[in-house]
UniProtKB/Swiss-Prot annotation:
Belongs to the MPEG1 family. Expressed constitutively in a variety of cell types including macrophages, microglia, neutrophils, T cells, marginal zone B cells, keratinocytes, splenocytes and intestinal epithelial cells. Disruption phenotype: Impaired immunity characterized by a failure to efficiently prime CD8(+) T-cells to cell-associated antigens. Defects are caused by impaired cross-presentation of cell-associated antigens. In normal conditions, mice do not show any obvious disease phenotype or a change in immune cell frequencies. The chain crosses the membrane at residues 113-120, 127-132, 235-244, 248-256, 654-674. It is found in: Cytoplasmic vesicle membrane. It comes from Mus musculus. Homooligomer; predominantly forms a homooligomeric arc-shaped pore complex instead of complete rings of 16 subunits. Pore-forming protein involved in both innate and adaptive immunity. Plays a central role in antigen cross-presentation in dendritic cells by forming a pore in antigen-containing compartments, thereby promoting delivery of antigens for cross-presentation. Also involved in innate immune response following bacterial infection; shows antibacterial activity against a wide spectrum of Gram-positive, Gram-negative and acid-fast bacteria. The gene is Mpeg1. One of its GO terms (molecular function) is pore-forming activity. Glycans are attached at N185, N269, N375. This is Macrophage-expressed gene 1 protein. Residues 1-19 form the signal peptide.
Amino acid sequence: MNSFMALVLIWMIIACAEADKPLGETGTTGFQICKNALKLPVLEVLPGGGWDNLRNVDMGRVMDLTYTNCKTTEDGQYIIPDEVYTIPQKESNLEMNSEVLESWMNYQSTTSLSINTELALFSRVNGKFSTEFQRMKTLQVKDQAVTTRVQVRNRIYTVKTTPTSELSLGFTKALMDICDQLEKNQTKMATYLAELLILNYGTHVITSVDAGAALVQEDHVRSSFLLDNQNSQNTVTASAGIAFLNIVNFKVETDYISQTSLTKDYLSNRTNSRVQSFGGVPFYPGITLETWQKGITNHLVAIDRAGLPLHFFIKPDKLPGLPGPLVKKLSKTVETAVRHYYTFNTHPGCTNVDSPNFNFQANMDDDSCDAKVTNFTFGGVYQECTELSGDVLCQNLEQKNLLTGDFSCPPGYSPVHLLSQTHEEGYSRLECKKKCTLKIFCKTVCEDVFRVAKAEFRAYWCVAAGQVPDNSGLLFGGVFTDKTINPMTNAQSCPAGYIPLNLFESLKVCVSLDYELGFKFSVPFGGFFSCIMGNPLVNSDTAKDVRAPSLKKCPGGFSQHLAVISDGCQVSYCVKAGIFTGGSLLPVRLPPYTKPPLMSQVATNTVIVTNSETARSWIKDPQTNQWKLGEPLELRRAMTVIHGDSNGMSGGEAAGITLGVTIALGIVITLAIYGTRKYKKKEYQEIEEQESLVGSLATDATVLNGEEDPSPA
């Protein structure tokens, strides 16, 4: 009976606790409870998510969202999370405009203008890998066209995050994984994880979005049409506007009818047209603006976004469980990963379509449009290798110079050290060891052991140190890797008559000595440069002394192209501008760029972090692996442990000595017991022998007495 009453009492306590919870936390957490209680829709256009500012793509959620309080917008129309607030547009904000974009360099996104125009990092390439931009650039260049854009925008809310918003669990865990590697001084692994963070969460965090709808028409019109009407560019935009209004069945005013002939010319010169509907009801031919606008309320989308770089949100108040200096190091690691993402997707070159040096792949102008080409001689490449551990790796990494047959440059050329890196390969082999117990009982134990072989390679290319004879160098026929093609052949191969030379881990450099047959496949070569070494050919004076610092760029009249990203280091090569610019635009190069180590190096166990600016120290609890601010007594104890460990024997040594002493004592005790038992057994045998001897003597005496004194018969 008592147990039954106790069970009822516990049930009542749980029920009361559930009843005291806020509305949004009863039973199943989430917006569904609020939605059922308030009978309102949930606002889906929310900030706090990650954003890839190169591709204009929403990424993983960075800021946490909860619906504990069942908040609503100020006008009571939508349910919103606790971590955001809205600014409703009280007035009607229907905007219509028409514009001409003469060059793709003036591109502006329809739905992410604000975040693309922020000035942090490499803002010149923001949005340059979005589908919208790449379509516009391709059509402008291929059709020799300009772009006209007409749009109708209706903004309903501006939704912003609160300053007290917390980081999401998934994002926090990813940061903690990076922190764990930084604590252990595993810098390469931390860099790899930071690049994965960029892959999953983007480069920025959205802090504000405009919720509404937009109807956009983009036309591409021949450039000649705009040049013929340069003095009346306004009438060109007006013609674009009339074409748009005709699509949405809008009644055109009588003033526009006089422009019928210009509108017809506009339509006849239009090479491409597209109408997009962002939010509202789906667009269809013949829809009216009135019908489209009435459907906006229940179909809101983001029509503009604003935000800050991802590393801005990695700060001590967002990660209170970590030491301040460690958070600062974490933020710097993530910022560096974002910069690498921008750097590896920045393609300098001539962006003027009318220049003979125009580079279709370039997304940033480098003032090479008017430069004249200088003929340079290519002295070949070679690569040295040194085994560091494990199996033989250098046989696949070494490369001799085709001109010398050795690891050297021909006379008149100087070597330029491009890069040195360590190559790792994992392998397993059967290893057998003899294991003994008490040095008596032995057996052979075999197991499959995983090991890492390492080798260091050093890549060089040869530059002419002065005047060299004609046809003394090699012909250059492009490069390719196991993941990229050679622009000369559009395949992973060299042109006919060319030989692939190995450089780095996977790069193939196509060269030829045949000036008669190979010349038609050759391209003017302007040098190599890497993340650590510039190009001596940029300045003719530095070519004479390759040890002098040189710029990481191409000479005038040459454009740079990616050769390979070798373990986080970009290596580029230079060819004559205007070559290798055909085909479609290059896709974005996504991280990670760094190879994770096959096996972790010797880790450093960080237990104390001190901030030199505030003189505050953090101690890591070995039981929970949690950080906390250290009290003076705890700091002294921790320092004593650290210095004690360093001055005394290690844990392994202490354990070994303890085990040895224990075994020795066991042997001594065993021998003592064995000796004692053997000694006692010997005593027992002597006593038995004595008793036996006495008994036999007594028997003999009795017999003798019987013979001497026989009893009377």
